Swiss-Prot record:
Record bears the keyword Chaperone: no
Gene from which this protein is expressed: atpH
NCBIfam families in the cross-refs: ATP_synt_delta (TIGR01145)
Entry keywords, A to Z: ATP synthesis, Cell inner membrane, Cell membrane, CF(1), Hydrogen ion transport, Ion transport, Membrane, Transport
Record protein name field: ATP synthase subunit delta
Residues of the signal peptide: none
Protein role: F(1)F(0) ATP synthase produces ATP from ADP in the presence of a proton or sodium gradient. F-type ATPases consist of two structural domains, F(1) containing the extramembraneous catalytic core and F(0) containing the membrane proton channel, linked together by a central stalk and a peripheral stalk. During catalysis, ATP synthesis in the catalytic domain of F(1) is coupled via a rotary mechanism of the central stalk subunits to proton translocation. This protein is part of the stalk that links CF(0) to CF(1). It either transmits conformational changes from CF(0) to CF(1) or is implicated in proton conduction.
Amino acid sequence: MSVVIASRRYANALLSVVEESNTIDKTLDEMNAISEVLHHSRDLVHALKSPLISYDKKIHIVEEVFKGRVSETVMFFLKLVGKKNRLGHLPHIVDEFKNLLDEDRGIINVDITSAVELSDEQANELVATIANMSGKQVRATLTVNEELIAGAAVKIADTIIDGTVRHQLSKLRSSLVAA
């Protein structure tokens, strides 16, 4: 089973449990804390992925690292994931949990890359346009890449809308070479 499919199943199971117990926001905070710890500790991620470290040792590590940081429900979930030998997928499971929660709440994540820094007015207008087109709430990440020359590229899930001069020049070059 692929990492994405397995991670989504585990995340979906956790989301179902916390929806029933009405602890979604608390669990989201805990998953963000787990994500933060994993992001800052490569050694922990490698240990959780390692086939050389036993299940018992991995569970001990998880208990020591996350004790007091997560609820009993999340700790039980982490132990279950460990028992199924999937702790190496934990970063993906956390990401999938957040993605599923965003889907349920009608939130889309959008990456906007522009050649110059957008003013607040420009950024707000672009975000509002995307929200109107999608009918969803937009969580935007803005970045600047001067190599784009001018314009902007917008990435929504698997779709990229590229309105950059660099992209237009690339298309022009391709058509001239083909001619």
